[in-house]
């Protein structure tokens, strides 16, 4: 945090809230705004309060891969500040309150009617899908424990006070890329979120970071692997996923 810092943007990664008590405390002492990146955390909560109301502004995504996904791109911002709400509403329509009169440089960020219609239908199923994902996460915990793979596979941990919605079920493993190729051969889908840390992205080269600047992030990027977690996943399918991972490490 420097004199140029205006806001802090914590990310509720994979469906679990960041430590908002600590982050909000730091921000308050420094006079900063806090913007929640809750794109992967719709329905998540911390100490009984939902993601999206834990800071000044909450940001959600309705990209099709999210727990509540549309038929294309879309999103939502939340705030209990009337002034911020008015400013955000203006920015989403080209910086305009009155048609063809622009008070600021804005963007075209309106949710189109098709996306709204799809989301309206799907919204009533969100809690059901969330419970399915949480059930499957608990089942993975049991299956990996029974398979005696906890020395090979580091499972996700839910921080006390958090309600995890498992947008992804992300484990950490050695030989990640080899394991992923093996699972693909066995018909098991997986994804890597994310393969390259932010400080090593080309767009940030001018900041002077290099490999070794953030070794914890770099190691995580080499080990993370997201396994199937969608609500309709059966116990037999999950058992097969775990069985194949066990077969790889034997």
Positions of the model-derived regions?
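Active-site phosphate-binding strand-loop segment of PLP-dependent enzymes
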Residues: 1-70, 76-78
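PLP-dependent aminotransferase class I/II
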Residues: 7-11, 16, 20-22, 29, ...
